[in-house]
Amino acid sequence: MLEKTIYYKMITLKVKNIIKEKLPLKSGDKIIVGVSGGADSIALLHILTELNLDLQLIAIYIDHGLRPDEIPQEISFVKGQAGAVGAEFESISVDVLALKNCDKLSTEDAARRLRYQAFAEARERYGAKYIMVAHNADDQVEEFFIRLLRGSGRRGLSGMPYQNGLLLRPLLSLTKADLLLYLQERGIDHCEDSSNREPCYLRNRIRLDLLPRLEEYNPSLRRTILNTSSILESEEDFLEKSARELFNRSTRINREGKLPKTELDCRSFSGGHQALQRRVIELICWQMDAQPSFTHIENICRLATEGTSAKTLQLGSGLRVKKEISQVVFHYPLGRIATRQGEREIRLERRIDGEGIFAIPELNRQLTISTGEGAGEGRLLVDREKINFPLLLRFHRAGEKFHPLGAPGRKKVSRFLTDKKVHGEDKQLYPVLINGDGNIIAIVGLAIAAQFKKTETSKQLISIGWQETTT
């Protein structure tokens, strides 16, 4: 009995030391704790109460809607365990299958996304400082193989960190066996999730099939993988710092114009190792809310080191990457477009059948057509009697002309935009609105054609609005 008592106290002490060395917890912190009812999370809940840190714990149970026969019992159990340690409790339901079908995700990925979203919302709602989950050393090994099979690089294979922003994992140095022994010695029960035995989930197949097979070749496989992850983590830290240094030397933010641009100096960039170059490109894209694929990163690296001036690449998010003499420019000439369809050309041809508000996601804008003078900055007014629906909103064509109101005669649309200090690809932010008879009514957001102007004899007006939308 003495050995058992010493062992469970050793586990608690080990977690306390991890928190002291690796996590930013302070006495009195309010913490969201993810508690499923399984051995890991129940052990975490009880260990946290034994640390004498005066933590304010909120136990959050996530009902994924996948095991309706087991959920009520688990909720009741977790609520009781939370009450036993003086923690608040809340059960949150999420619709995993709806997200899975909508976004074409696996069940595991949809559940993970909704789970962490629910934790984040709970943290805001309770005013908590951190979110804590019960990932352990066995989870770390399984995650290594999941990421390996998905093609992760060094960063992914270095494993889950003890801290990732506001997310804390204090049990990563403990095995599943450690936690089960802790519960056994403390006389604490836990729930068994039947889905952990279902072979339809990748993590289960790795745990139940792949790992036992590999352990026939190396009985110390799990320790070997953890050591490898630790080595990769240290090397990852070094590479990340080196990439940051190259990033700082070779990039700058240009805030001139309507949208900020990131400019990459090709000479400074080309002096870096290829491994660092890839990281710099990835970092630029992530900071600009784009998720680059490996192919995107390779193409942009070649553009910076070998590409000719004026060559352009475009990511599906709307991020455009262009070589301009000695630099590569990353920007959103058309606003942030929430798609992930790979590199593509943006086209615009929108039929407008009458009054209304029309979302133009291609440009992150909305067009408003309404009777009367309307309200809002940048509204253009035209004579209603001269408007023939349906209208057409599209990009201007090469050489296309119109007669701007107030100008002595016709002018090329492109030249007019240049005179208005709208240059290059930014010109696509101002498409033309075409009347039913084929004439240009307006360059939306900027100017109307003279023949559509309001006069003293105008009986009714049409207001044309052009606003940026939020994403």
UniProtKB/Swiss-Prot annotation:
Enzyme class per UniProt: ligase
* GO biological process, alphabetically ordered: tRNA modification
What SMART domains does its record include? Answer: TilS_C
Provide the Gene Ontology terms for cellular component.
cytoplasm
Task: List keywords of the entry alphabetically.
Answer: ATP-binding, Cytoplasm, Ligase, Nucleotide-binding, tRNA processing
Q: What is its EC number?
A: 6.3.4.19
Q: Does the keyword Nucleotide-binding apply?
A: yes
* Main subcellular location: cytoplasm
**InterPro entries per the record?**
Lysidine-tRNA-synth_C (IPR012796), Rossmann-like_a/b/a_fold (IPR014729), TilS/TtcA_N (IPR011063), tRNA_Ile_lys_synt (IPR012094), tRNA_Ile_lys_synt_N (IPR012795), tRNA_Ile_lys_synt_subst-bd (IPR015262)
What is a GO molecular function of this protein?
A: ATP binding
Reaction(s) the record says it catalyses:
cytidine(34) in tRNA(Ile2) + L-lysine + ATP = lysidine(34) in tRNA(Ile2) + AMP + diphosphate + H(+)
Q: Which Pfam families match?
A: ATP_bind_3, TilS, TilS_C
Location relative to the cell: Cytoplasm
Superkingdom in the source lineage: Bacteria
Residues given in the record as ATP binding sites: 36-41
Q: What is known of its domains?
A: The N-terminal region contains the highly conserved SGGXDS motif, predicted to be a P-loop motif involved in ATP binding.
What family, per the record? Belongs to the tRNA(Ile)-lysidine synthase family.
Function in brief: Ligates lysine onto the cytidine present at position 34 of the AUA codon-specific tRNA(Ile) that contains the anticodon CAU, in an ATP-dependent manner. Cytidine is converted to lysidine, thus changing the amino acid specificity of the tRNA from methionine to isoleucine.
Q: What is this protein called?
A: tRNA(Ile)-lysidine synthase
